[in-house]
A protein has these predicted regions:
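A glycine- and small/hydrophobic-rich beta-loop-beta segment
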Residues: 87-90, 95-123
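Glycine-/charge-enriched secondary-structure boundary and capping motifs
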Residues: 18-36, 41, 45-58, 108, ...
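Glycine-rich phosphate/pyrophosphate-binding loop regions near the starts of catalytic domains
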Residues: 1-101
Length: 196
């Protein structure tokens, strides 16, 4: 994969705090690139986002691009009823809340292998809204519902776990041996989401 960046920051003027925002954002982006071994192919410079006294919110957006055969691409939409669904947490450093980069890369490599072997029906990255939002979006694509397990940790459903993964498994969870995961539920044939 290659990254591209689009950045919007207020006019910097002579205020050191304003200069610190793009510096911190770009240093963080550079750290992620370096640790994951993923280069950036450039981006569009949109630094001046000010008009009179109005400033844009400081923003750095990254898009990841890659090439593959169409036959190897997947979807985030659940494919069939009766599938087990697993949550794979992104390994993070508890002190800094940053990914543990080496382990994160190993997790992504392992999931890529599972996708290639055809044992993953659907995969989604957890973003804003947490695991619950990821599961809901996976339901919408093919109108396949979802029943959360009774013992699911409800505190994690809306927790900020960005970068974690939700996988619909083709045939059980034996394929996840050696990977940290939690079975969170099962797909169902009714277009509804059940949390008892």
């Amino acid at each position: 994969a290659r990254l591209t960046f689009q950045e919007y920051f207020e006019r910097l003027r002579e205020d050191p705090r304003r200069w610190g925002k793009p510096a911190a954002a770009l240093l963080g982006a550079f750290l992620a690139q370096k640790e994951m071994g993923v280069p950036s192919i450039g981006g569009k410079d949109s630094m001046s986002g000010s008009f009179n006294d109005l400033d844009v919110p400081p923003t750095l957006v990254s898009f990841a691009l890659s090439m593959t055969k169409a036959s190897r691409t997947g979807s985030a939409a659940f494919r069939k009823a009766g599938s087990l669904v697993a949550f794979l947490p992104l390994p993070v450093d508890e002190k800094t809340r940053l990914p543990r980069w080496k382990e994160a890369g190993e997790l992504l490599d392992e999931v890529a292998k599972l996708v290639r072997f055809g044992v993953v029906n659907a995969a989604s990255v957890v973003g804003e809204g947490g695991v619950a939002a990821a599961v809901a979006k996976m339901c919408f694509g093919n109108r396949i519902g979802f029943a959360f397990n009774h013992d699911v940790d409800r505190r994690t459903l809306f927790a900020p776990l960005a970068g974690s993964l939700v996988l619909e498994l083709r045939e059980g969870d034996m394929c996840l041996e050696g990977v940290e995961y939690t079975l969170i539920g099962t797909t169902i044939d009714r277009p509804e989401i059940v949390l008892d």
